Amino acid sequence: MNHASKYLYYNRPATKWNEALPLGNGRLGAMLFGGIDVARIDFNLDTLWSGEGRNKSNSSDKKDWNAIRTAILEEDYKAAEKSLQENILGDWSEAYLPLATLTLERREERLREDIEGYSRGLDLTQALYKETYIEEGISYEQEAFCSMEDKVFVLKLKASKTALNLNLKLKSPLKGIVEGEKQHTLILTGHAPIYVAPNYYHCEDPVVYKEGKGIAYAMGLRVQTTGLVHIEEDTIHIVDADEIVLISTATSDFEQEIGYNPASVVAEQLENISHMPYETLRERHIEAYQHYFNAMQLELGEAKTDRTTDERLRLFEEEGCKDTA
């Protein structure tokens, strides 16, 4: 791998969220954790929020600012706070919500622990995620991007032999439903909750759903592979493949016309995009991304970029700017 200054690089999978590597196109985002036995990708969508479109401002006609000021000056803070909460402040702002988690799990147990040359990284010049390692003489490679041009997330897995045997499971932390469709496709659909309390505010019902209310959303995942495919509920099973390409997209009915069907939209998008070769999608993504990325360049001097990103961060915390970053 290229460990240039514009490359985030790790020699182990992420163990926590802030070690995962981000991809996004301004609408659909993904956090890639990497992994050998189980890999995880968390997705989010820009328009997936709680709420149902109601006016959350305070309609009280008792907005007596002078009384509040007087209470504060008299150090009667409880009275001032009570009046503010009842007559001035509106309800909580809406909560931004996670969309889904995709797990890629090996179908068989590893008999040996010797993994050679594990590496995962993010090439900032091309917005490409890459992961490589060797196991029992077989080379495994992953590459992923989130295309602004075609509005899809794409992940390619490749092995030097027909050694890719995976279960791909799509789940949502919301009350979504995942169904297998034709053409090696999973479709996740659901409605966002109408109310989500802040995590620091304790109440009896911190998350509230209401049937038919809340933002409707959908996410689609389609597989193209040289292996055998079987779909069972929320899982795609793949056997004896040497190459797998995953294409995913998502949408919601936020600020859309009445009758907008997110599930139909993502199904149509996947159908249209699946006819494009992986290399074409990759080239279109890089060209669109670099139009913005290459508009300027910031040089901060030489850096010891042979170290992994987590090692550079650790040294920076310990030593400051002593040529470690």
Where are these regions (language model features)?
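Aromatic-residue-lined binding/catalytic grooves and analogous aromatic/hydrophobic interfacial grooves
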Residues: 1-325
